[in-house]
UniProtKB/Swiss-Prot annotation:
GO cellular component: mitochondrion
Domain Protein kinase stretches: 148-477
Chief site of localization: mitochondrion
UniProt similarity note: Belongs to the protein kinase superfamily. ADCK protein kinase family.
Organism annotation: Mus musculus (Mouse)
Keywords: ATP-binding, Kinase, Mitochondrion, Nucleotide-binding, Serine/threonine-protein kinase, Transferase, Transit peptide
Gene, per the UniProt record: Adck1
Binding, ATP: L154, G155, A156, A157, S158, L159, A160, Q161, V162, K176
Job of this protein: Appears to be essential for maintaining mitochondrial cristae formation and mitochondrial function by acting via YME1L1 in a kinase-independent manner to regulate essential mitochondrial structural proteins OPA1 and IMMT. The action of this enzyme is not yet clear. It is not known if it has protein kinase activity and what type of substrate it would phosphorylate (Ser, Thr or Tyr).
Annotated active site: D308 (proton acceptor)
Location(s) in or outside the cell: Mitochondrion
Uppermost EC category: transferase
InterPro entries: ABC1_dom (IPR004147), ADCK1_dom (IPR045307), Kinase-like_dom_sf (IPR011009), Mito_struct-func_regulator (IPR051130), Prot_kinase_dom (IPR000719)
Name by which UniProt lists this protein: AarF domain-containing protein kinase 1
Length: 525
């Protein structure tokens, strides 16, 4: 009996050893691939974070200086633990972490500043894995498809990485290859997040982050389908074809699949790289203006919005043929399609914000689900204080003091913010994320909250609302009347913009004259 047991143990050991060698040789022996490891890590991190909040703030008077200080420390510790979890579990976790890191004025700064780093911390697939995906999806080896293929990726993201390659006909292309394990893990990861969010809500009733899970559940399958990304790229290129400053790389459909996307290779600097713009004599204000026009057109006029404009996805360059500044828009996996009702309400809301119509602000905020929290909603949309909203967001640029106040208030109003995010239409969530990403770019460029950006938004709102009215108009006379009203409103905006420029020019001349007088003054004495 003992001999049989020994023999069985020997054969079992051989089988396990052989399995281990096989798994190792095929690069599958990765703890992150085992569901139990990923689940255990996520559960443990959630438990530690929850325990920290429960115990660290228990004995401190709410709202006191000590409470605020301790809460900030807990936020920072928790953000770092969440960051480590995202880096360890990768894939979907990094994607969700990046989303949270983009919500600059909606979440405490400790979280956004910590998680923002995930945009540059995405894992890379090995060349063996890249070859495997290309072989499985395109049915050929890399050397059969490309004259050359750079092993080092141009960039890696949470779901994929991009390599530079040259086709046999000499064309230079960018090859986007999905990480091989993301597809299989994504649905399980989202289910795990859903369970954890529900569990945490039992401990903290004010913790309402199911909206984040719902968004991931809806959007991740679309982002993992690169054919969908290619269709989005072609749609937005056609939709914004009248903007000569926009470049969307062409898709090569013959070598594209759900996990591999081949596109035209376009070089440029990141949109937040001021040094690159200065070196290439690209006007920062012009780029900021173009970016604002492009997104206003997407949101207010077309209702088809690129929702991931972080700096790595928006490049700038000088056009080779004309030398004019050009924006290159990349990564078209995540778009938000706005319903007409939402788009028109959002147009009315921004018109109310721009022209300080407080009754309209309340009415359209409530139509969009803000209820009595409409002042907070206005602050979230504009990233301005309620005092600035009441005075007019175009009247004065945001100050460092106001910006700091808003960021601090995000921590104080976290329960109300999460409640609001659970009640607004789902379409609003990605719009808020997009707003914050664009605002971050403008802050880096030093062009935030310029009057011209609000005027461009207002132009698009007027056009969108007029187009809707003309479609519903029953007669030619009524359509003509609407067209005249639209033209008059646009003329008023143009006149207002002209007056602002004249005022700025006069101020510049006055300052120049004053500086000239000051430099000459010592010689007179």
């Amino acid at each position: 009996m003992a001999r049989k047991a020994l023999k069985l143990a020997s054969w079992t050991s051989v089988a396990l050893a052989a399995s281990g060698v096989y798994l190792y040789s095929n690069n599958y022996l990765d703890p992150n691939d085992f569901g139990a490891v990923r689940v255990g890590r996520a559960v443990a991190t959630t438990a530690v974070i929850s325990y920290d909040y429960l115990t660290s703030l228990r004995s401190v008077p709410y709202g006191s200086e000590e409470y605020l200080q301790r809460r900030s420390q807990v936020h920072l510790r928790s953000a770092r633990r969440l960051f480590e979890l995202c880096c360890a579990n990768r894939g979907t976790f990094i994607k969700v972490g990046q989303h949270l890191g983009a919500l600059d004025y909606l979440l405490p700064e400790e979280y956004t500043s910590t998680l923002k780093v995930l945009h540059s911390q995405a894992p890379q697939s090995s060349m063996q894995e890249v070859r495997q995906v290309i072989r499985e999806d395109l049915g050929k080896e890399i050397h059969d498809l490309f004259l050359s293929f750079d092993d080092t990726p141009l960039g890696a993201a949470s779901l994929a990485q991009v390599h530079k390659a040259v086709l046999h006909d000499g064309r230079t292309v960018a090859v986007k290859v999905q990480h091989p394990k993301v597809q299989a893990q994504s649905s399980k990861d989202i289910l795990l997040m859903e369970v954890l969010v529900l569990a945490v809500k039992q401990l903290f009733p004010d913790f309402e982050f199911m909206w984040l899970v719902d968004e991931a559940k809806k959007n991740l399958p679309l982002e993992l389908d690169f054919l969908n990304e290619g269709r989005n790229a072609e749609k937005v290129a056609h939709m914004l074809r009248h903007f000569d400053f926009l470049k969307v790389p062409q898709i090569h459909w013959e070598l594209s699949t759900k996990r591999v996307l081949l596109m035209e290779f376009v070089e440029g600097g990141q949109v937040n790289d001021r040094a690159y713009m200065e070196k290439n004599q690209i006007d920062v204000n012009e780029i900021s203006c173009h970016l604002g026009k492009m997104y206003s057109e997407m949101i207010f006029v077309n209702g088809f919005v690129h929702c991931d404009p972080h700096p790595g996805n928006v490049l700038v360059r000088k056009r080779p043929d004309t030398g004019k500044a050009e924006i290159v828009l990349l990564d078209h996996g995540l778009y938000q399609v706005l319903t007409e009702e939402f788009r028109l309400d959002y147009c009315h809301l921004w018109q109310s914000l721009i022209w300080t119509d407080m009754d309209g602000l309340k009415q359209y905020s409530q139509r969009l689900g803000a209820a009595d929290l409409y002042p907070l909603f206005a602050c979230m949309l504009t990233a301005r204080s309620w005092d600035s909203v009441k005075q007019g967001i175009g009247q004065a640029p945001v100050s460092a003091t106001e910006d700091s106040e808003i960021r601090n208030n995000a921590a104080c109003y976290l329960p109300e913010i999460s409640q609001l995010l659970n009640h607004v239409p789902r379409q609003m969530l990605l719009i808020l994320k997009t707003n914050d990403l664009l605002r971050s770019i403008e802050t880096t460029l030093g062009t935030r909250s310029s009057a011209s950006s609000f005027l461009n938004m207002s132009r698009c709102c007027i056009r969108a609302l007029a187009e809707h009215k003309k479609r519903d108009a029953g007669s030619f006379f009524r359509r003509t009347q609407i067209s005249f009203s639209e033209a008059f409103s646009l003329w008023q905006i143009n006149l207002h913009e002209l007056l602002l420029r004249v005022r700025a020019l006069r101020l510049a001349c006055w300052v120049s004259a004053l500086l000239g007088w000051l430099t000459r003054a010592p010689h007179r004495m």
